[in-house]
Design a protein with these regions (language model features):
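Short glycine-rich substrate-engagement loop in P-loop NTPases that contacts/grips substrate
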Residues: 67-97
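Structural recognition of the conserved hydrophobic beta-strand(s) that form the central parallel beta-sheet
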Residues: 125-131, 152
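Accessory nucleic acid-recognition modules appended to NTPase machines
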Residues: 65, 200-355, 360
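Domain-level recognition of nuclease-like catalytic cores that cleave nucleotide substrates
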Residues: 393-418
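Conserved lysine of the Walker
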Residues: 45-46
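Hydrophobic anchor at the beta1->P-loop junction of P-loop NTPases
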Residues: 37
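Interdomain motor-coupling "hinge/lid" segment immediately C-terminal to the ATP-binding subdomain
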Residues: 2-13, 139-246
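Pre-Walker A adenine-sensing motif
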Residues: 14-32
Length: 418
């Protein structure tokens, strides 16, 4: 790796990065903080770096003070930790002053955290992205020495999706023609998710298949040196098919072995951990489980509805619950649970006194009674401040045994910010 290559990369990025058209996303950062943005591939991490760069340029920072390096650049293949110093040398051979660094997919270079810590120690401002949740692990935090703040990045919310397709929310968006327009767009978002680059693609399944294959091979098979690709593929598919129910490691192992592919519970545990590290999977615990059960029996959801849709037929009920999981996880993260002990409640946030059921349709009395009965029972054990049933389009309210239960269509719920 040579210094001249980094001079070229720095100059190239300075030419185009300020002109990139962006859908503005919520981004509230401390002026002198250093940040690590982590999320699944194509969630929009690079665009958040561009957005931050454009904010700085608007606030008077000179473009010459910006150093952006994307480590997915094929010219940087084979880069080692010893080559990082060439970035500093290249910049200081071009300009004077103290640059602000933006490093995209830096986890591609082994040992990156030591370099990032050195920059922070030397009072550089640094913004980093990566597609591996291990970047948020205690090991990395220890190496970084608490010098970086982490931000999880997800694909577009529905409101961000609407910005991307240039649909504005008018004053009374819940009613009339505007409501009909929003529901049409929600159907596409509900089915195919919110990856920024996907928004304007017509062949959405093809795009999503391509993304999944990159995640599968680059972030799973290659990174973790997996030899039994068939078992891993089956594990992903069985997780997708089990999205609405608690799933034990033993059950997953048996489902895979039933196809004739050997796969032990310990191997399944490794696969699930890899899927979590690749930011493909969200996992939540049963609030009332014992410690061992918390580790072995969880509910698993996909980080975007489009990825889940690749694996299931008749997907409506699974997609609705998956969307609820994503929406709640973004806000509550590790404070989000499900409840399963004599009663079944899809989502429970004990710190907020919030319980949420996902039910695609409320068209029959049996469904209504099941969902309401579970919420009332939970309220009897742990008094709730808010109880909700999220549907695809049904709306209303039920009061039972002193508990007010809101019935909300998902498209309204996600736009109202919970």
């Amino acid at each position: 790796m040579e210094k001249e290559l980094f001079r070229t990369i720095i100059a190239e990025s300075q030419e185009y990065i300020g002109r990139i058209h962006l859908v503005q996303r919520p981004l509230y950062l401390e002026e002198y903080g250093n940040y690590v943005f982590v999320g699944v591939r194509q969630a929009g991490k690079s665009y958040l770096l561009y957005q931050r760069i454009q904010q700085l340029l608007t606030n008077g920072v000179d473009i010459e003070d910006i150093v952006y390096v994307n480590f997915d650049d094929e010219r940087l293949q084979g880069m080692s930790v010893a080559d990082f110093d060439f970035i500093l040398q290249a910049y200081h051979s071009m300009y004077e002053g103290q640059p602000i660094f933006f490093f995209d997919e830096i986890q591609n270079v082994e040992g990156w955290a030591n370099f990032a810590r050195r920059l922070a120690n030397q009072k550089y401002r640094v913004y980093i992205t990566g597609s591996n949740a291990k970047m948020l692990s205690r090991d990395i935090e220890t190496v970084l020495g608490g010098r970086y703040l982490d931000i999880s990045v997800f694909s577009y919310s529905f409101s961000e999706y609407l910005k991307a397709v240039e649909v504005l929310l008018s004053k009374n968006w819940q009613y009339g023609r505007k409501a009909n327009e929003l529901q049409r767009h929600f159907r596409t978002y509900f089915d195919w998710g919110g990856f920024p680059e996907l928004v304007h693609f017509q062949e959405k399944r093809i795009w999503l298949n391509s993304l999944y294959n990159r995640i599968f091979f680059n972030d799973l098979v290659v990174r973790h040196k997996i030899k039994n690709e068939d078992a891993l593929r089956l594990c992903v598919r069985r997780l997708a098919e089990s999205v609405k129910q608690p799933c034990s490691l033993n059950r997953l192992s048996n489902l895979i072995k039933a196809t004739g592919t050997p796969c032990s519970p310990s191997t399944v545990m490794e696969y699930v951990r890899y899927l979590q590290e690749s930011c493909l999977l969200i996992s939540i615990d049963n609030y009332v489980s014992k410690f061992v059960e918390k580790e072995t029996i969880k509910k698993h959801y996909f980080v975007d509805n489009g990825l889940l849709h690749l694996f299931i037929n008749n997907p409506n009920t699974s997609l609705l619950e998956n969307l609820c999981a994503i929406t709640l996880y973004k806000k509550y993260a590790k404070g989000l649970y499900y409840y399963n002990k004599n009663i079944e409640v899809d989502f429970y946030v004990p710190d907020e006194g919030l319980a949420v059921q996902a039910s695609y349709q409320m068209s029959d009395g049996e469904t209504i009674e099941r969902e309401v009965k579970a919420l009332v029972a939970l309220h009897g054990l742990h008094p709730l401040k808010r109880a909700m049933i999220i549907t695809y389009e049904d709306e209303g309210e039920i009061v039972r045994d002193g508990l007010r239960i809101e019935i909300k269509p998902a498209w309204k719920w996600v736009l109202e910010g919970l």
